[in-house]
Each structure stands twice: as C-alpha cells, then as structure tokens.
Amino acid sequence: MKIFFIDNFDSFSYNLVYELECLGYEVAVYQNDIDPSYLMDLMNEESKTPLLFISPGPGNPNSSGNLLKIIAMAKKKFPILGICLGLQALAQSYGAKIIRSKEIVHGKATAIALKKHAVFKGLGESMVVGRYHSLMASGLPKNLEVIAEHDNIPMAIVNEEDKILAYQFHPESIMTLQGRALLEQSVGFLEGLL
C-alpha cells in the first residue's frame, strides 16, 4: 500500500516516515499547503487504493494550511490515519470541537486504557505512549468511536465505515514502547477495510 503523507510542518514527521519505510511502505511526502485537488488527482492515479496519513503539527486544524480541505476531499474515498493534530483535524471534520486540554504535555509518557479492538490485538489492555499536545477533541459525534482514552481525553478514535483511524499520542515516540507494532497494525487494519 502506498502512503500519501501530509507533513504539517512538524519535527516528528520524518520520524514517522522513517518508521513507515522500515515497515516496507512506499511513502510520498507532501506538505499541508499542497493544492487539495492536485493531491486527490495523484491519489486517484494509483492502481491500488492508497492511504492518506496526517502527521502531527503545531497549532490547530484551522491554522494548518489546506489540511481540512484535504480531509474533506479524501474522507470516504481513501483510508486515513491521523496522528495528534491529525486526530484533531479528523475529529473536527466530523463536528467535534477542539479545545485546550486541562493538562499541557510535551514529552510525557502516559499509560492509556485500550478498549478491545482489532487494531490493538496483542498489545494488552493498556499501553504506555508518548504525548505531546495542549489541545484535545471534545464532543465527538457517535460515528467516531473512542477506542483508547486517558483522563477523558480521546487517545484513539475510529470510524470503520469511513476507514478513519487516529491517535492523539505519538506512535513514533521512543516513549511509545510498542509504537512500530501499532503503526504496522494500524495500516494493516485500514488496508483490511478496503
């Protein structure tokens, strides 16, 4: 599966690209200021359905270039995997509010509770993850299922019908001990929904 990776001008982006390439995926990187129509044309030219990957980034979804337009055009057409800002942008695209978290974290290892879901197979009931965020998604609609959380903050959301999966934490962080396995299972899970 080819991955179209949206870089939200974040220092973690190429750590994620490296992890995905180590897993054997072909990754094409585009920044969030790319013309959304051009990106959709590129994705539609692929012989097999590609995956759209949304990186972490500074700020909020509204200040992230063409990110929300890209999501609006890709949603329901391509599987989408979002990390941190990626979760917030996907949640906002479904009507959730993005608010300031009661705790600002930058490089904090946190044990989060995992719900029983295929994407977490073999990873246990909780997982230590690396968190870097000051914002969170709130007021999620019913069509976004929260499959992991910490202190009432959604840490993982999914919409299987629309092939959407997102994490508030950073799988590529050294603090996320099973991060590579989770990335592999995440891409595999979305690929299996095609």
Curated annotation (Swiss-Prot):
InterPro entries noted in UniProt: Anth_synth/Amidotransfase, Class_I_gatase-like, GATASE, TrpG/PapA_dom
Q: Which residues bind L-glutamine?
A: 57-59, 88, 134-135
Q: Where is the Glutamine amidotransferase type-1 domain?
A: 2-194
Q: Look up keyword GTP-binding and say if it applies.
A: no
Q: Which UniProt keywords apply?
A: Amino-acid biosynthesis, Aromatic amino acid biosynthesis, Glutamine amidotransferase, Lyase, Tryptophan biosynthesis
Indicate yes or no for the key word Kinase: no
Write down the chemical reaction(s) this protein catalyses.
chorismate + L-glutamine = anthranilate + pyruvate + L-glutamate + H(+)
Quaternary structure, per UniProt, is:
Heterotetramer consisting of two non-identical subunits: a beta subunit (TrpG) and a large alpha subunit (TrpE).
Q: What is this protein called?
A: Anthranilate synthase component 2
